[in-house]
Each structure stands twice: as C-alpha cells, then as structure tokens.
C-alpha cells in the first residue's frame, strides 16, 4: 500500500487559484454583500461566484433553455441552489412547514430535493430571494453554513429507526462534530442575517485562513447498517456499543469517490481503518484529522487535494501517527463490526421505545406535487399534525419518526391519500441518482430524469429472468464528480456525454468495494444489452444469497478493485 511509496508531507509548487481566492476573501466575505445589490445581472461575479459556496450555495442556470437565451442575446437564467446544514438529517415539522412554504413561494421549480447527504436543497432561487432564504432558515433554527466548498460538509448519521437510544447518542455526536468543525468567521451572520460587524479580527483555529484544501465529508455510522455509505467519506466514526449503549468509535479515514475522466491520477477509494477511540476523544480526533489534512493536503492541484490522496502520498501509518500526536492519544485496535445492508426499510417499523417510524420511498428525493401524486402537499399535511420529527435518509428517502400508536392510522391515511405509500419494486427502492440536468453545471449526461424509465427496463430484465423480487444496488451519476455514489454501486453509471455513460460493475450490496469500469462511453441500448446477458447469468449461476456484484467478481466477469491508487484504471 502507501508505505511502499511515501511522498512528501507537503506538496510544493504554485498554489491553485482557489487558494488565492480564499486568502483574499477576508474570511469568506469577498464583495458578496455589494454583489447582492447589483441588479444588472442575476448572478454573482468574479470570486463571489465561488465564495457563495462556503455559504451553502451554488450558482446555476437552466441548461434546457441556455441556448435559446443565448440566441435571444440574454444571459443564462441564473439561479442559486441552496443546501441546508442538517446533521444526521433530522428536521422538525415546524422547520418542514417553513421550507415547504419557501419552496412554493420563492423558487423557480417549487420543489424540495432530498439529497444523499441527508439534507434538502432548494433549486432555482433568484438573486433577490437569496438573502430571504438565509433569513427564513435562521428564523427556524437552521442555516446553510459550510454545506459546500472547502470545509467539513453536512455530517451524516445512520437513520436507525430501531434502536432509538443508540441513534439518539450517535446523532448527538454527529451534531457535536458538525458544530466543532464549523468555520468561526462572522461573514455568514454579517452578510445574510444583518448582524453588526464587530471590531474583532476573525480567527479560524481549526480550518485556518485558507480553510481546507478541498471538500471534507464526515459520517457517524451505526452497524450493521451502512446506509450513509461510509466509504464515500473522508472521516468516519463507526459506533461501537456495549449493552445497547455507545462506548466509542472505530475511525476510518480517506474514502472518496470523485474522479476525472481519463485522469489516472484520480481514483475512487474506500476508507482505511485507523483504530478504536473512547467517546471522550471524539472531538479531539476529529479536529486532528481535519488539521492534518489542512496542513498536508495538496493545495497546488485541486484534482489531487482530497484526504484520500494525502493518505496515499504520505502513507497511512504516517498520517495516523500525526493524528495520534495532535489528538494526544494512541488508537486501540479496531473493534469488531459488520455491515449487512445499506438500503432503507420502507414502511412501518416499531422502535424499542414503542413509537413507530414510517419510512417513505421518495424517488430520487424529489418532493413535488405530481399529477395524481401530490407528495409535497401530503408531507405538509403530515407535518401539520405530527408531533415527532422527520429524518432525511442518505438514500434520499424520508422517515416520519416517533409516531405514537394513536397517530399511526391518521398519518398512514394521509400518506396513502397523497401517493406517498404507493408500492414499488425492490429494484426501484435500491436505485438512486444525482440531480444532473437541467440545473447542474457539471452534468455530462442525464441522471435524475433518466433513472425512472431506465429502472423500468431493468425491472423488465429481472422479470424476464424469473427474479422480479430481486434487486441490484444501482446508481446513476451525471458526471465523474460522483454525487450519485455510483462508485459504490453494483451497477454504476457515470455520465460521459449526452446519452452516454461508463458502466461500472463489481461493487457489493453493503458498499465496501469499488466497482471497476466494464464498458466505456456506451448508450442505453448497449447498457441494457449487457445487463440482460449478465443478469441472465446471475439468475442461473448465482450461489445462495449471492448479490449481483459479488457474482460478477466470482464469475470472473470483472476483476475486483483491490488497491485503487494502483489498480483502479487497470
């Protein structure tokens, strides 16, 4: 592994322009406040275009009408995506009612998009509504700080509806980690919440004046569920319990899925085990991992700036020893843990506290009133009467949590009446896509708009081969940045060009193996032809309980990725 080829602790060379931008931004202020008042353009200019990402927003435009507007000599229809900070995906029904109203009244698309990072996004916020959205969030105890760009992003936590006490403890740690790693700059409060500037120099004791070299993602995981896909993340705390009570965490570092087409210096990587730590060291260890990456991460090349590349460059043992030094601890040996699945259990589940939890399947996380299926209205009506909370899952679904027996029938009636409990196949429940077109500027191929009809065709293949109740973990991502987490799927499609994808095979159901590229730059008919043949073989030749991804590896159809830094592209 990495120790065979240790590299420098710090990469020397000309810093990327992003580093200049951060340094000159006055702790993320830039000239955003002035830009807000420029009515000549619907977008943000210069450095502000990137700086708003630190405030939880991306500037986008509707790519479906981009060419048409260009012909009319109009600028693109700029609008912002805003992503809320929501550790563990827990949101109150009061907060839900507020975001429902904002989506309806102040966004182009009128939808709420649940993401696979356990939060929600608004798409289509015009510039005039940017400040009001931050103020609305603040009024209900939410914010969008540090949900994008070079910071610790939204902290995920297993949406475990069974063991309520353990989930509550893990969720509290997810919140503590999130708060501890937040930026300290007052820029967010000054710009969006009109808080007074104070005569105190900003300091960033953890993140530093130029923040992190690249995005950084953290999870808290409760085995045996790997619903949050820990191997997609930089830093992972795997909960270890004794007698149902949380006692500590196993730490895994250096996961990440983003690649660049054709760039063999990039690769998807699973996280590496560092060791076990008692609870009282959690925040010190989290800070130590982040500051080590802050100081050692590559600031000359953003394509090689994530923690996974730092770990490979300096060596796992070197990185681990530095974390131990900074945190003032020695990791204990990894404690036993096992993952058995990562899908959500759709429907009602009774928790150990005798409350009920209803997990609703939301295809691709898009909450909108569809013809005959008014999902958004249904959730609003549930929010008006539900005394518990909602939980957004990392599979883009929604849990109506902590429902007392007395409310169960009423909530189920509302859900059914609004199309929120329509029967779907196991295959559809285990399929997921990122947003992609028309709003994502990085999209190379369709994802969210492509997946439903593509799933229909995969369902037909399963039916053809006599296994209609089976499922394959299937993900579509519109570009190699990998937001759809296709690089941890059994079938992963990565957008290459309009209507064309790279097909990856060989991941597994529990999300612990990176799939390898099987075919490159192929169309939907080619993909379906390959899947028809391979699913047919799987149906006939599989061993008892063997998932599709495991079968493709065992049958020699695809070689497993064992050491991504060296064999991902082979």
Swiss-Prot record:
State the name under which the record lists this protein: Sulfite reductase [NADPH] hemoprotein beta-component
Question: In this entry, which stretches build a coiled coil?
Answer: none
Q: In which family does this protein belong, per the annotation?
A: Belongs to the nitrite and sulfite reductase 4Fe-4S domain family.
Q: Where is the signal peptide?
A: none
Q: Which reaction does it catalyse?
A: hydrogen sulfide + 3 NADP(+) + 3 H2O = sulfite + 3 NADPH + 4 H(+)
Q: How is the cofactor bound?
A: Binds 1 siroheme per subunit. Binds 1 [4Fe-4S] cluster per subunit.
Instruction: Provide one Gene Ontology cellular component.
Output: sulfite reductase complex (NADPH)
Cystine links in this protein are: none
Origin organism of this chain? Salmonella enteritidis PT4 (strain P125109)
Q: Which NCBIfam families match?
A: CysI (TIGR02041), PRK13504.1 (NF010029)
């Amino acid at each position: 592994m990495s120790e065979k080829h240790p590299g420098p602790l710090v990469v020397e060379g000309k810093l990327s322009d992003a580093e200049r931008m951060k340094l000159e931004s006055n702790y993320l202020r830039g000239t955003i406040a002035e830009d807000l008042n420029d009515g000549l353009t619907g977008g943000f200019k210069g450095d502000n275009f990137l700086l708003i990402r630190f405030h939880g927003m991306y500037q986008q435009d509707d790519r479906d009408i981009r060419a048409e507007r260009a012909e009319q000599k109009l600028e693109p229809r700029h609008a912002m995506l805003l992503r809320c900070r929501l550790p563990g995906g827990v949101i109150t029904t009061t907060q839900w009612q507020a975001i429902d109203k904002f989506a309806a009244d102040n966004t182009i698309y009128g939808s709420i998009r649940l993401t696979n990072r356990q939060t929600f996004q608004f798409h289509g916020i015009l510039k005039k509504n940017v400040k009001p959205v931050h103020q609305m969030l603040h009024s209900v105890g939410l914010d969008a700080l540090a949900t994008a760009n070079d910071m610790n992003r939204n902290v995920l936590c297993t949406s475990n509806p069974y063991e309520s006490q353990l989930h509550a403890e893990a969720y509290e740690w997810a919140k503590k980690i999130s708060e501890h790693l937040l930026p300290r700059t007052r820029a967010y409060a000054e710009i969006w919440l009109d808080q007074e500037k104070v005569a105190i120099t900003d300091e960033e004791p953890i993140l530093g004046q130029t923040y992190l070299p690249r995005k950084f993602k953290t999870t808290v995981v409760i085995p045996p569920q790997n619903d949050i896909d820990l191997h997609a993340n930089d830093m992972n705390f795997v909960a270890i319990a004794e007698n149902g009570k949380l006692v500590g965490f196993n730490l895994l570092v250096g996961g990440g899925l983003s690649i660049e087409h054709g760039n063999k210096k990039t690769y998807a990587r699973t996280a590496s085990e560092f060791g076990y730590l008692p609870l009282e060291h959690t925040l010190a260890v989290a800070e130590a991992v982040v500051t080590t990456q802050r100081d050692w991460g590559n600031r000359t090349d953003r394509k090689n700036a994530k923690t996974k590349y730092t770990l490979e460059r300096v060596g796992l043992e070197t990185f681990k020893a530095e974390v131990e030094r900074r945190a003032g601890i020695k990791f204990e040996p990894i404690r036993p843990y096992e993952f058995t699945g990562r899908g959500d259990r759709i429907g009602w589940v009774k928790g150990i506290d005798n409350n009920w939890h209803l997990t609703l399947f939301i295809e691709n996380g898009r909450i909108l009133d569809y013809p005959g299926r008014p999902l958004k209205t249904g959730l609003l009506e549930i929010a008006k009467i539900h005394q518990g909370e909602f939980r957004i899952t990392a599979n883009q679904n929604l849990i109506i949590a902590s429902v007392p027996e007395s409310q169960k029938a009423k909530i189920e009636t509302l859900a059914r009446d609004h199309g929120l409990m329509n029967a779907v196949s196991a295959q559809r429940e285990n399929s997921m896509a990122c947003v992609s077109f028309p709003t994502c500027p990085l999209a190379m191929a369709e994802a969210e708009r492509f997946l439903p009809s593509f799933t229909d065709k995969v369902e037909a293949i399963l039916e053809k081969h006599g296994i209609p109740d089976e499922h394959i973990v299937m993900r579509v991502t519109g570009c190699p940045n990998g937001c759809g987490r296709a690089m941890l799927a059994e079938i992963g499609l990565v957008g290459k060009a309009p209507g064309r994808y790279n097909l990856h095979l060989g991941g597994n159901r529990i999300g612990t193996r990176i799939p390898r590229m099987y075919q490159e730059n192929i169309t939907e008919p080619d993909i379906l032809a390959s899947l028809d043949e391979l699913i047919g073989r799987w149906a006939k030749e599989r061993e008892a309980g063997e998932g599709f991804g495991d079968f493709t590896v065992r049958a020699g159809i695809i070689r497993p990725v064992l050491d991504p830094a060296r064999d991902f592209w082979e």
